[in-house]
Swiss-Prot record:
E.C. designation(s): 5.4.99.25
Pfam families membership: TruB-C_2, TruB_C_2, TruB_N
Protein name in the entry: tRNA pseudouridine synthase B
Active site (catalytic residues): 48
Function statement: Responsible for synthesis of pseudouridine from uracil-55 in the psi GC loop of transfer RNAs.
Gene source species: Actinobacillus pleuropneumoniae serotype 5b (strain L20)
Amino acid sequence: MSRPRKKGRDVHGVFLLDKPQGMSSNDILQKVKRLFQANKAGHTGALDPLATGMLPICLGEATKFSQFLLDSDKRYQVTAKLGKRTDTSDAEGQVVETRAVNVGEAEIITALEQFRGDILQVPTMFSALKHNGKPLYEYARQGITVEREARPITIFELRFIEYAAPYLTLEVHCSKGTYIRTLVDDLGEVLGCGAHVTVLRRLAVANYPIEAMMSYADLQNLSENQPLEELDKYLLPLDTAVESLPKLNLTAEQTKAVGFGQRVKFENNDQIYGQVRLFSHNMQFLGVAEITTDNVIRPSRMVNI
């Protein structure tokens, strides 16, 4: 039997959800939030309903650092079907063009070369990017096409996995803002046959290991059979969301000053500048600060627990 709903609680950390297929990221976010009975929750970059895989969910104070995960690199495995283009560039859309598939593995591997490194990508109309305050997908559903500017992205790795015509499987390591559906659609055009996504799984966000993910079904089972506090054991610490930033350990005096929101002058022997993750003298994560060029610690996003 499901636990009766109670007043929300202050719970803090990052939950690595293995998102199920067929649900929007926001819908599954709300379900996870209810299971944890959390006052505050947010995800770190939406996955399409068709997609599965890693969706870090920030609870409580972790929401202050969700942008760092949104801006981080992602890794995906995608299966594309060659020969058909759809209006959404995935299997959930309507087929708009069908062409013969006359390409082999060698041609595909050659075509992949032009998609590696720093490239420009025109976002799909079926995206949450906004034009005049309205998401592009709302225009698309009305049959309206809005002119979009190409955006710079980086494909760090584009690995050929398998080709069993007409299905092609790839692994992609990419920067923020990359649309895998658009990548597949563009590849289909280069190959001359068209293509769309049939399977998409996010394997990694930042440095989070795939082994740390938990399915919603398993989380739900835990919530029904274990005390609420047992769920908290599956939350990762707040500072994991900003693990890519340099670490700065403070003295007791500096910790006290930063706790009052004060800027602190310090001897920057390591010459660290820009954003850092701050830890107190007793190794407690305090938040994120900016180190200025005149060696001042300027608190920006601080934990309040």
